[in-house]
């Protein structure tokens, strides 16, 4: 579960490394975000000479959380870190690669472009 002021790693090659959540957009609960929810964040750490700079306000979709997710088939899954992928206004990723495993719940929320870029879908 991600809330306001939570730090997330970035799982793509857009240039940002860490973001801080400042607002939860796509969630039933306005205080917490889970996998597949859209957040607004501010870049706290970025690579030099990249299009995304430190202190930029960006939109991102959450792809991994430390909080255990319970699936309908009884399986529970959790990841080692909280991570997000930076997206544009059309919900397409701004980067061209996605690193690390991605939860398959993103497919249900129509983020198929992120799923296709991911090397591993769990």
Swiss-Prot record:
One of its GO terms (cellular component) is cytosolic large ribosomal subunit. CDD domains: Ribosomal_uL14. It is found in: Plastid, Chloroplast. Its main location: plastid. GO terms for molecular function: large ribosomal subunit rRNA binding; structural constituent of ribosome. SUPFAM superfamilies: Ribosomal protein L14 (SSF50193). The keyword Acyltransferase does not apply. HAMAP family: Ribosomal_uL14. This is Large ribosomal subunit protein uL14c. The gene is rpl14.
């Amino acid at each position: 579960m991600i809330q306001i002021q939570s730090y997330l790693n970035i799982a793509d090659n857009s240039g940002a490394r860490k973001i801080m959540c400042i607002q939860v957009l796509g969630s039933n609960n306005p205080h917490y975000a889970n996998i597949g929810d859209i957040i607004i964040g501010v870049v706290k750490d970025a690579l030099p000479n990249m299009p995304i700079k430190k202190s930029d306000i960006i939109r991102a979709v959450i792809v991994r959380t430390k909080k255990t997710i319970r699936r309908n088939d009884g399986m529970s899954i959790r990841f080692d870190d909280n991570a997000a992928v930076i997206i544009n206004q059309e919900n397409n990723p701004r980067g061209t690669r996605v690193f690390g495993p991605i939860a398959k719940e993103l497919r249900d929320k129509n983020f198929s472009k992120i799923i296709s870029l991911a090397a591993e879908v769990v």
